[in-house]
Amino acid sequence: MSPPPGTAPHPEPTALPFRRIALVLSGGGALGAYEVGVLKVVERIRLVPSLVSGVSIGAINAVAWLAAGRDVRPIEQVWLTARAESLGVQWVSLTLRVIGALTASLALLEVVLGLAGSRELSGAYWLWRKGSAHIDLVSTQLDLALWIVLALAGGLTALYARRVARDLDRRSQGVDPVGLRARLKRVALAATAVHLVVWVMGWPWPQRFSASVVLLLLLAWLASTPGHVGRWLRSLALGLMPETSGRGLWSGRARRRILERIVVQGDRRALAGPGTGLVVSALAIDTGLIGHFVSWPDPDPVFAEKLSHELGEVLPVPDANTMISAAVASSAIPGLFQPERVLGRDFVDAGGFSNQPLHVAIAHGADAMLVVLLTPSSSPALSSPPADVVSLGGRLLELANWRDLQTELRHLPASWTEAGPASRVCVVAPREPLPASLLSFDPGRAATLIALG
């Protein structure tokens, strides 16, 4: 197969005492620029792996590298110009959408409260012209007093949150959801009736506070119902989330565009079809299994059975577009990016469960492998306790990757661990944590990470 115009020709394989060398690229978000540096070395020594397996950002790099004819230059150019916004991490867009949604919601709430909580619009005022400044003053004072009481109650709840949580947990034991919904309905209707009577009569009353409580009770009850209105309200609340209808903060469109641009300029045939060797792993939401998307048709049943024992499933892709979707799904960090639909099913990033799937390469028949990690592979010593949530999250990711690697290494075939003329597993990993975080996409940091790789 001749390389496409504009790409470097395939180098001759390096002479090594192995027949089938696998390249495993792990996940780690913006740290994935480190893998580009490793791929530059792989290209320089003319190493041509028979299998490339990628997870999360490793899947993105794997698909882009193979589609570019194993030429690192297009991928390096993407990394050296990539920022969080260009990869779909749209913090400004998210902020504007949230502000817009909150502004619209509060404005509509004020309209409702202006109609339902105003004595000037009550039946008593318009039908009987009954009322006085004294009634207005009393209503305003009652409103203010009740809002102050509510603020104090909220502050005390936050102050004694543990005690309140224990009390709620004790009271909620054995609660019937259907009965609770029925009681909520009765309370909401009773509060509505009281508010309407007072509103029509024009009596001194905390009008806006009362209208707020009634509105919240009615919305809570309607949202808890199983019917069409309840489903609509729940979907409306989820719809306030940007781009993804509540299944994540951002979509995968930006990552898809980057891969499609590289594939269009490269060779689509490298991503799907006979003679290819690409595996992209993602977590299936419906079954909880790790879906291993393979680029070749009719995978070996023995290969599929071995992965089934590791709670995985083999999913052959019919074309390059499906493999691109698989890579987008593999890099869809749960909670941040929405799940990606591939072959009619939803998948997300599998890095938290299997970040360096060595067993996939072994099951495929590899007799040696090059494993690229984005965190130190040695026992992760802790210099100081994590100072905040972000550093704690980074520490937990480091530990999860380290534990996953140790588990994979302990399941290597016995012949791989015996002394021999050459090591069968080469682990490439930074000696210290890399100077970047999961979402810190930046050209300067990327250049540093590529140099370290």
Please annotate each region the language model reported.
Residues 4, 16, 20-22, 29-253, ...:
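Patatin-like phospholipase
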Residues 9-15:
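A short, basic/flexible loop-to-alpha-helix module at the beginning of a structural domain
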Residues 263-279:
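A short alpha-helix-loop-beta-strand transition element characteristic
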Residues 6-8, 35, 255, 353-357:
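Amphipathic coiled-coil/heptad-repeat helices and related helical stalk/stem segments
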Residues 65, 383, 436-440:
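Short acidic, glycine/proline-rich loop/turn micro-motifs
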Residues 428-442:
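Short helix/strand-capping connector loops at secondary-structure junctions
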